[in-house]
């Protein structure tokens, strides 16, 4: 069917999020044509999407091309959007609670203030997306969020850990390299093996978060709250661990990798 994603695209996305083969997401980008209609054109209008949502409580929007649409304020709760194309779409203030966003392409999209509580973002491509102030409480995230803006976002109880059960293509985990998580609420989040190289975590709430084996090289945690956070074997090479709140109550901070090479006050 015209406009539907070829299997090679899905495979390329999965390959971009695994270890150890792919640590550079640009490798995945080079394997697909991002200027093709699949990635740039929409097959529906906002009005058609809204009508479908009104007519069916849980419509199937999987693999739909919604690129560039303004879908702000719409309610996609529990809707199946698996494999949909939402590049450069505007979703500000929209609701995606419990929605399936697995394998979604949402490059440079705007989700500011959107609610994605309990949503599934497995193998999703959110690179460069704006998720500032979004609510991802208890969401499952294992995708590419490199350079994404998550400042002030709510990720309390979210699961960003590596998928240790399905490793046929390698280690699937959230990739947040150079992402902006300034002031984000990550309390109680599971970030075991999550990759956050050079991420901005200044002022973030990491209390009771699981950071075991996380990659935090070059990350800025200035002023972050780390009470009860588990740093066992997290790589903190060149990370800024300055003015941490609750550092004495953090777990296994002394067991973090390359702690002697971190920037500390």
Can you say where each PLM-predicted feature lies in the sequence?
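Tandem repeat scaffolds
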Residues: 23-265
